[in-house]
Amino acid sequence: AETRNFALRDKKGNEIGVFTGKQPRQAALKAANRGHKDIRLRERGTKKVHIFAGERVKVKKPKGAPAWMPNEIWKPKVKKIGVEKLDEI
């Protein structure tokens, strides 16, 4: 599977950033970790917009984490809401 580019869109449809990942969810997790809540990702080269609800929560660091890692880390969570088809980009 190739790495795909997903353009992050705001409510007006402006593309405000690009996140990469093999799956839309992987890109959505990266967007959520930057603090985006309403995540709309358009796959490059298509008219599909994948819609996710994102959040990030503070969790304790995992067992076996390296010593330099802080005790609490941000963990992104996303929930897929659906896919929209655009008439034009």
Curated annotation (Swiss-Prot):
Keywords assigned: DNA-binding
UniProt GO BP: DNA protection
Highest classification ranks of the organism: Archaea, Methanobacteriati, Methanobacteriota, Stenosarchaea group, Methanomicrobia
Superkingdom in the source lineage: Archaea
Record keyword DNA-binding present: yes
Keyword GTP-binding recorded: no
Cited function: Protects DNA against thermal denaturation and modulates transcription.
Protein name per Swiss-Prot or TrEMBL: Chromosomal protein MC1a
A Pfam short name: MC1
GO molecular function, one term: DNA binding
